[in-house]
From Swiss-Prot:
HAMAP family recorded: CPSase_S_chain (MF_01209)
Similarity section: Belongs to the CarA family.
Record-level Gene Ontology MF annotations: ATP binding; carbamoyl-phosphate synthase (glutamine-hydrolyzing) activity; glutaminase activity
Biased composition (Low complexity): 1-32
GO CC terms of this entry: carbamoyl-phosphate synthase complex; chloroplast; cytoplasm
Protein name as catalogued: Carbamoyl phosphate synthase small chain, chloroplastic
Record's keyword terms, sorted: Amino-acid biosynthesis, Arginine biosynthesis, ATP-binding, Chloroplast, Glutamine amidotransferase, Ligase, Nucleotide-binding, Plastid, Pyrimidine biosynthesis, Transit peptide
Domain Glutamine amidotransferase type-1: from-to ranges: 261-446
Source organism per UniProt: Oryza sativa subsp. japonica (Rice)
Active-site residues (renumbered): C336 (nucleophile), H420, E422
One GO-annotated biological process of the protein: L-arginine biosynthetic process
Residues of the transit peptide: 1-50
Region (Disordered): 1-44
Amino acid sequence: MAAPPATASAPSLRPSAASPRAAAARSVAVPSGPRTVGPRRDGGRFLGVRAAKAVSGVQSGTVVDDGVQRPWKLSDARLVLEDGSVWKAKSFGASGTQVGEVVFNTSLTGYQEILTDPSYAGQFVLMTNPHIGNTGVNPDDEESNRCFLAGLIIRNLSICTSNWRCTETLEEYLMKRNIMGIYDVDTRAITRRLREDGSLIGVLSTDQSRTDDELLEMAKNWKIVGVDLISGVTCDAPYEWSDKTDSEWEFKKGQSTESFHVVAYDFGIKHNILRRLTSYGCKITVVPANWPASEVLNLKPDGVFFSNGPGDPAAVPYAVKTVQEIIGKVPVFGICMGHQLIGQALGGKTFKMKFGHHGGNHPVCDLRSGRVDISAQNHNYAVDPESLPEGVKVTHINLNDNSCAGLQYPKMKLLSLQYHPESSPGPHDSDLAFGEFIEMMKNNRL
């Protein structure tokens, strides 16, 4: 069943073509500081289109015939932000021109999980940890079957990898997936700018024929607010989650001796969420974001899970309508985007945060017990607790800014969290939230 028309169409997030490029000659690096190309101006934004080509053999750490790794390379890329600043950098991965929203992530590890998190669709992820690529990548740590982010921004690209599970380098991984990346740029200065000014639209380009002013105009005219990004990351048809949960993933076993059938709405769901639910004894049916609530309820599930996902919850009214038709009928658990959709379905409002929460070190307080957990978070929007109807309880708050981080409505048999209890990457402090969902389904059977 097709979804109702959204407020705006989803952007094309992948490059249109890929081809080899020659290796760069040894040269002295160009300074990576910003320079201003024009005054800051406000204005509407429209969707930009990227054409990019894969890079071959020009990354930091290129291996030459004598087997020596040589990390030097010319600065061949630019990141132009909508505030007029231009940041020189060196490219790796794909080349071309790409537009997206620049956000920073404070996680020290887990870059592969971040790369494959669908919630980053349409965004450039800037890693505040300066050393990235040290452990390479492997097929086990992916959170989805592809990368949806616009690009990766890092300070230092490791010239070697060291991990027993590594199967390829970060450079090779991005080339195969046609994802742009830049390094040797002042990520700390960019992070400070985002912290002060908020998330900024940026254009990343290796195309030397484009002027800084042209790239700046692209950044100012691009739009992400009000765009339905979920339709570009959700699955095409329902399926049963059949991934065997290895002992390595089961850091806690035996949480429940009962089996529960859970229908999970895929708004950009992460694999480790499904693994954690499976570890708690759940049989999971995953359905697309636009799947009718009536068909889900006909399956007579023990519970319904609303997943994480990218973008603006106000841009997907069809998803809000689905949540409204399901809550109160079966136990419901929502994470991140699911939490925001539940808030809207209950009559509340959501708003865009200044620079969002992205990282694995956010303290949250459970107001019911006073317990403080360190959580993994990834969202640019939040629920306004003042807009919620009577009876809905705010159960958790983010201790950095006191924003709403959790909801509970016992009458409707629902709970939701603004952060990721599966924590991939991140600490496992909040894994007990899955146990709460299990208890809700168990009590509903009585």
